[in-house]
């Protein structure tokens, strides 16, 4: 166990815009917790997941049953949008894994 405190002298955060998954923290939380271990704050508006595990979740989304996908919270016409199919969600997760900081193995999600 270490006892000496160290403070980051450089901490840079930049967020890219994402138009998908707005107001969908709970669905993403349930999706990630269904198959992997990740970190989320109490209100689920910040989540972190290993990049490789996120890609595994994307693969799992494409393989899961329609019933399971709906149980997680996605369904046809969700938020008046028919795009949220399993293929669409899986491809978005892959895109976010690709777009995340290449120097970090963790993909950070934040809703604000």
Spans of model-derived segments:
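Acidic (Asp/Glu-rich) sequence patches and key acidic residues
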Residues: 1-105, 111-112
């Amino acid at each position: 166990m270490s006892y000496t405190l160290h403070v980051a002298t450089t901490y840079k955060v930049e967020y890219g815009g994402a138009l998908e998954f707005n107001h969908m923290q709970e669905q993403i939380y349930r999706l990630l917790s269904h198959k992997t271990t990740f970190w989320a704050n109490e209100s689920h508006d910040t989540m972190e997941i290993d990049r490789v595990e996120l890609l595994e979740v994307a693969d799992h989304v494409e393989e899961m049953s329609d019933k399971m996908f709906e149980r997680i919270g996605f369904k046809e016409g969700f938020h008046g949008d028919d795009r949220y199919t399993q293929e669409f969600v899986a491809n978005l997760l892959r895109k976010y894994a690709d777009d995340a900081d290449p120097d970090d193995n963790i993909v950070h999600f934040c809703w604000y």
